[in-house]
Amino acid sequence: MDLTPIAVTDGLAFAADIQLGTIITIRSDGRPQSSDVHHAVLDGTIVFSVRPDRAKVFNIERDGRVVYHVSHEGSYLSFDGTAEVSPIATETHGPAMDTLINAFRAVAKKEHPDWDEFREAMVRERRRAITVTPTSVVGLINPVWG
C-alpha cells in the first residue's frame, strides 16, 4: 500500500483533534530520537511545551528537520517539517509566555483556573515552546474518522 500525500491543512485538522503525537528528531550521531508529546495546532503549525534540558531541544537546535507522527483509530499521519525552539520563558508576560498560553488553551480547550499560577510555573520550570512547521504529510485517514 502506498502512503497517500495529504494536504497539510487536512493533516493539521486531523492532528488538532488528536492532540497526542510523537516528535522524531535527529541525534548528533544521526540516529532518530522520538518523544511522545501533547500538542496544539496553532496558525498552521504544531506547538508543544518542553523543559529546556530535553534531548529533543538539543537535537532541534542542532538540526531542525523533524517528523511529527499522529495516529488514532486506524488513521495515521507523518508530517515532515522543520522545528524551532522558543526562548526560555523567563518572564510572566511576553512573546514566549504568549505561545505557551495559546498552546495550553488549544490542548486543554479551556482557560486555566489560575493564569498567575500557570505563568509562574512556566517560568519556574524554564519552559520553552517547540513549533513544528509542516512541509508535507503522508499517511492514511480512516474514512470512519471524518
Regions found by a protein language model. Give the residues of each.
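Alpha-helix boundary recognition
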Residues: 15-16, 61-62, 123
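Extreme N-terminal tail/first-helix region
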Residues: 1-17
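Short, solvent-exposed cationic patches
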Residues: 1-3, 53-73, 106-110
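A generic secondary-structure signal marking the coil-to-beta-strand transition
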Residues: 11, 19, 44, 75, ...
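Charged, gly/pro-rich active-site loop segments
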Residues: 1-5, 75-146
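Short beta-strand segments
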Residues: 18-52, 58-60, 66-70, 78-82
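Short amphipathic alpha-helical segments and helix-helix/interface helices
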Residues: 11-12, 57, 119
